[in-house]
Amino acid sequence: MALTFALLVALLVLSCKSSCSVGCDLPQTHSLGSRRTLMLLAQMRRISLFSCLKDRHDFGFPQEEFGNQFQKAETIPVLHEMIQQIFNLFSTKDSSAAWDETLLDKFYTELYQQLNDLEACVIQGVGVTETPLMKEDSILAVRKYFQRITLYLKEKKYSPCAWEVVRAEIMRSFSLSTNLQESLRSKE
């Protein structure tokens, strides 16, 4: 989907804002954006989830990857991967046909800002205490989770109910990651 000129300008401004900021204060700056993203996901609902009960599916969210990662340095790459995968999922042409374009553009902007915030922290190397293998295993688990979601959408031929089930699943997983971010902030 071609992004509108206004969205491109917004992305450029957000990119400059995050690259010009000093320090990595992720839990404070990132949590509000996560809440806005959740609100946008809720607003994107087009049909009742109750009408799609037959399409429910357990995607196997890798909750242990988020439940066991209590240090910021261990969590940031996993959160980054999750948000990148959400961005990729909702950036497809099949996705743009399923959602209101204005809400989708706002959603992209929020995700893009969060990706920039996380990338700034990764670049700064916020404490490299985890083993690379643990981080890679966690990132791989997130990628497999999103592969299952993508496969489900293909099998359901990107139906409105399939997208609604996926939207609800993304809200649930995003909410869990937001709770993790808030617990990180409270530990600082």
Swiss-Prot record:
Disulphide-bonded residues: 24-121, 52-161
Cellular compartments annotated: Secreted
Major location category of this protein: secreted
PROSITE patterns linked: INTERFERON_A_B_D (PS00252)
CDD domains: IFab
GO annotation, cellular component aspect: collagen-containing extracellular matrix; extracellular region; extracellular space
Keyword Glycoprotein: yes
Effect of residue 177 to L: In a breast cancer sample; somatic mutation
Gene3D superfamilies on file: 1.20.1250.10
Pfam families: Interferon
InterPro entries for the chain: 4_helix_cytokine-like_core (IPR009079), Interferon_alpha/beta/delta (IPR000471)
Keywords: Antiviral defense, Cytokine, Disulfide bond, Glycoprotein, Pharmaceutical, Secreted, Signal
Carbohydrate-modified residues: 129
MF annotations from Gene Ontology: cytokine activity; type I interferon receptor binding
Role description: Produced by macrophages, IFN-alpha have antiviral activities.
Family: Belongs to the alpha/beta interferon family.
Subunit-level organization: Interacts with IFNAR2.
Name this polypeptide is given: Interferon alpha-2
Species for this entry: Homo sapiens (Human)
